[in-house]
Regions:
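Condensing-enzyme catalytic core mediating Claisen C-C bond formation in acyl metabolism
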Residues: 3-7, 30-34, 217-300
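Active-site-proximal alpha-helical scaffold in enzymes
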Residues: 76-89, 143-154, 159-195, 233-255, ...
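Acyl-CoA/ACP chain-elongation machinery
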Residues: 37, 185-231, 264-278, 305-312, ...
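Flexible, low-complexity linker/loop segments at domain and module junctions
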Residues: 1-6, 94-101, 295-297, 328, ...
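A glycine- and small-aliphatic-rich helix-loop capping segment at beta-alpha/alpha-beta transitions
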Residues: 20-27, 116-130, 180-183, 203-216, ...
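Glycine-/small-residue-rich "gating" segment that lines the acyl/pantetheine channel
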Residues: 127-134, 172-175, 179, 196-252, ...
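ACP-dependent fatty acid/polyketide chain-elongation machinery
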Residues: 1-65, 248-260, 352-366, 410-412
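Conserved beta-ketoacyl condensing-enzyme motif
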Residues: 6, 27-165, 194-205, 298-311
């Protein structure tokens, strides 16, 4: 079987515009959740989010092209530019060299894509007529345009894939890239998960199904994974990117190697459109598959940990079941308490965070652990990051519709 390694990483979220700043803030236990600034949310039951307020899309795009790309695409370009530069693949013109282009692909993921663009253009259409719809609307909203824009940006001519699996999309994008390399469809893949749904219809829609925390007066305490007083997730936005590469190709060009891909697991709940399967049965099967493939001792788990009642409870049960007992479960944390739930971007972001945690020997905390929940009784690295050397990390992502993805990385 072909070995696959990580040779480049990048991310942007409410705590940082790059991976170094982001991880430093996460390790410090900082929180990027605050009151929404991008629109007037005063009439909404939810008025908080993990919003990125200091990102200028003209840093990664020609100003005249900004209107052609939805914000989720702009965030993807920011993260992928960092990852591609980090990988050392780019030539003097910031392009994938022609001799590598045909054997490099893109695997992207997003849960909803250009929701804000859909909302805005729907209003234009109904209020001002169809002639007022932006001619760039469709191509700014389609999920697979992440791959379209990034492949054009870097001259990547291999497989161009897209995963649309709600909150598991970023993780499934990693898995699809792995499968492509394993089957010799490419030697390297640029993976990116991106999401930006902090808009009236996004907040309103998730609030209407009681999925979001209403702790509006305490934004930084609103997302509290595994805490007894949790009452919903907080929307985040961002993008995470990784360059996955066949080991021999990476060694040949003397690339820096961050980690080696060890295993993946996928499953479906066939249970409910929003609720997880009882006791996390689907999550258990995905984790079991990943662990059986990886054959490593996992030292840290970045949990899906959304700060919703059933997800956190059932994920905790699934972890105990898959590792054999409460005592055998390694340290677990959810970084969603700090940057919010970035939906389809979450899996890619959390994979980057997990790999950085492994390499730096710093396990991120689960913040806002104040009231223990007897149903969530694992070691969640409460409130303060922990210095600990681990050789392998696991990242979980579970999405609406009962779609589950798990990835494991190990030290190279």
């Amino acid at each position: 079987m072909r070995r696959i390694v990580v040779t480049g990483m990048g991310m942007i979220n409410s705590l940082g515009l790059n991976k170094e700043d982001s991880f430093l803030a996460i390790a410090k236990g900082e929180c990027g959740i605050k009151h929404i600034e991008s629109f007037d949310a005063s009439a909404f039951p939810v008025r908080i989010a993990g919003e990125i307020t200091d990102f200028d899309p003209t840093e990664v795009m020609n100003p005249k092209d900004v209107k052609k790309a939805g914000r989720f695409i702009q965030l993807a370009l920011k993260a992928t530019r960092e990852a591609m530069k980090d990988s050392g693949i780019l030539d003097a013109h910031n392009r994938c060299p022609e001799e590598l282009a045909n054997r490099m692909g893109v695997s992207s993921g997003s849960g909803i894509g250009g929701l804000g663009n859909i909302e805005a253009n729907s209003i234009f259409c109904f209020e001002k007529g169809p002639r007022k719809v932006n001619p760039f609307f469709i191509t700014s909203a389609l999920v697979n345009m992440i791959g379209g824009f990034t492949s054009i940006e870097f001259g990547i001519k291999g497989p161009n894939l897209s995963s649309v699996t709600a909150c598991a999309a970023g993780t499934h994008a990693i898995i699809e890239a792995v499968k492509t390399i394993l089957l010799n469809g490419a030697d390297r893949m640029l993976v990116v998960g991106a999401e930006s749904t902090i808009c009236p219809v996004g907040i309103g829609g998730f609030a209407s199904i009681k999925a979001l925390s209403t702790r509006n007066d305490e934004p930084k305490k609103a997302s509290r994974p595994f805490d007894k007083d949790r009452n919903g997730f907080v929307m985040g936005e961002g993008a995470g990117a990784l360059v996955l590469e066949e080991y021999e190709s990476a060694k040949k060009r003397e690339a820096k190697i961050y980690a080696e891909f060890a295993g993946y697991g996928e499953s479906g709940d066939a249970n409910h459109i929003t609720a997880p399967a009882p006791e996390g049965e689907g999550a258990f099967r995905a984790m079991k598959m990943a662990l059986e493939m990886a054959k490593v001792e996992v030292g840290y788990v970045n949990a899906h940990g959304t700060s919703t009642h059933y997800n956190d409870w059932y994920e905790s049960i699934a972890l105990k079941n898959v590792f054999g007992s409460k005592e055998k479960v390694p340290p677990v944390s959810s970084t969603k308490g700090q940057i919010g739930h970035c939906l389809g971007a979450a899996g890619a972001l959390e994979a980057v965070i997990s790999i950085m945690a492994m390499n730096q020997g710093i396990l991120p905390p689960t913040i806002n652990q104040e009231t223990p929940d007897p149903e969530c009784d694992l070691d969640y690295i409460p409130n303060v990051a922990r210095e600990k050397q681990v050789d392998a990390v696991m990242s979980n992502s579970f999405g609406f519709g009962g779609t589950n993805g798990v990835v494991i990385f190990k030290k190279a």
